[in-house]
UniProtKB/Swiss-Prot annotation:
Name used for this protein in its record: 3-isopropylmalate dehydrogenase
Pathway info: Amino-acid biosynthesis; L-leucine biosynthesis; L-leucine from 3-methyl-2-oxobutanoate: step 3/4
Organism from which the protein derives: Corynebacterium glutamicum (strain ATCC 13032 / DSM 20300 / JCM 1318 / BCRC 11384 / CCUG 27702 / LMG 3730 / NBRC 12168 / NCIMB 10025 / NRRL B-2784 / 534)
InterPro entries xref list: ICDH/IPMDH (IPR050501), IsoCit/isopropylmalate_DH_CS (IPR019818), IsoPropMal-DH-like_dom (IPR024084), LeuB_actb (IPR023698)
Binding site for Mg(2+): D212, D236, D240
Its job: Catalyzes the oxidation of 3-carboxy-2-hydroxy-4-methylpentanoate (3-isopropylmalate) to 3-carboxy-4-methyl-2-oxopentanoate. The product decarboxylates to 4-methyl-2 oxopentanoate.
GO molecular function: 3-isopropylmalate dehydrogenase activity; magnesium ion binding; NAD binding
Taxonomic classification: Bacteria, Bacillati, Actinomycetota, Actinomycetes, Mycobacteriales
GO biological process: L-leucine biosynthetic process
PROSITE patterns named in the record: IDH_IMDH
Length: 340
């Protein structure tokens, strides 16, 4: 396996090191290439993501990312658009995959959360995040700004098909989330596409929630969900709420996936770079290790993905949450569990 590694900023390199430690415990064929991408490189020479970087990344089977960001040093939007979004569009990461699971031993902010185990499949390259818009008369009382949400049948269908395949392998329930009563054009396209693709998956039960209803159900009845499929903007909202109800983004992993396999997909923890605790050895690497398990599953190594997830579940359930996390100790415990 040829693996591109982007440690990034803050705690990113620390948690990525533990994810690699775990990967190497279950596989002996991993060849890694490290990439200096993120705030550090930008502040040093102004570079974000060059054509040469992209060409080199494309030579790998997958990408493992730690965290990107330097709040206070780099203005908002520069790293997001110049690095992360550029990579997403260049590598056609049209599926953003966000599992949400409440592990034993983890406290949810919900009083009676029930069983939380669902996945959000978010479209990643269309919608309101394409940069299609503009502004005139900026800074005047007559300023006008618009953002155009772009939805194509091709873009929606490939993500919807991915979601149906995922639902088929899980509990066989898919929920479309949109706002079809108001966003009649884009929402109508999504609804029609789901209805048509659903005919090919008769075993999958399909329902629909408006985005406002879905945000309520995530708090009042999260166990109703199995696979949620939605567009870019609504997915951005739902995935963070999903992370919150299942114990926080410290345990949240994600995948940015080219489902065709043409380009390497990228896997990363949801948390940020947390520069305030960087270098102290107290960052929780669990989400990064879960991201590594997602990476293996994407590449077809289901057995080792399950082994890692099982070891993580046991480790999380057995933690003394009154004690501080040790980054390296978490990685060591999971490796030991895998080797026992």
């Amino acid at each position: 396996m040829k693996l591109a590694v982007i440690g990034g900023d803050g705690i990113g390199p620390e948690v990525t090191a533990e994810a690699l430690k775990v990967l190497n415990a279950v596989r002996d064929d991993i060849e890694t290439t490290d990439y200096d991408l993120g705030a550090r490189r930008y502040l040093k020479n102004g570079e974000l993501l060059t054509d040469e970087d992209l060409a080199s990344l494309r030579e790998h089977d997958a990408i493992l990312l730690g965290a990107i960001g330097a709040p206070g040093s780099v203005p908002p939007g520069i790293l997001e658009r110049g690095l992360l979004l550029k990579m997403r569009f260049a590598l056609d990461h049209h599926v953003n995959l966000r599992p949400s699971k409440l592990y034993d031993g983890v406290e949810s902010p919900l009083r009676n959360p029930g069983k939380i185990d669902f996945v959000v499949v978010r479209e990643g390259t269309e919608g309101a995040y394409t940069g299609n818009g503009g502004a005139i008369r900026v800074g005047t009382p007559h300023e006008i700004a618009n953002e155009t949400s772009v939805n194509t049948r091709y873009g929606a269908e490939r993500v919807i098909r991915y979601a149906f395949e995922l639902a088929q392998s899980r509990r066989k329930k898919l929920t479309l989330v949109h706002k079809t009563n108001v966003l009649v054009h884009g929402g109508g396209l999504w609804q029609r596409t789901v209805d048509e693709v659903a005919k090919e998956y008769p075993e999958v039960a399909v329902d629909y929630n408006h985005i406002d209803a879905a945000t309520i159900y995530l708090v009042t009845d999260p166990s109703r969900f199995d696979v949620i499929v939605t567009d870019n903007l609504f997915g951005d909202i739902l995935t963070d709420e999903a992370g919150a109800v299942s114990g926080g983004i410290g345990l949240a992993a994600s995948g940015n996936i080219d489902a065709t396999g043409t380009n390497p997909s990228m896997f990363e923890p949801v948390h940020g770079s947390a520069p305030d605790i960087a270098g102290q050895g107290i960052a929780d690497p669990t989400a990064a290790i879960l991201s590594a398990a997602m990476l293996l599953r994407h590449l077809g190594d289901e057995d080792n993905a399950v082994r890692i997830e099982t070891a993580i579940a046991a480790d999380v359930a057995g933690r003394d949450n009154s004690q501080p996390i040790s980054t390296t100790e978490v990685g060591d415990r999971i490796v030991k569990a895998l080797q026992s």
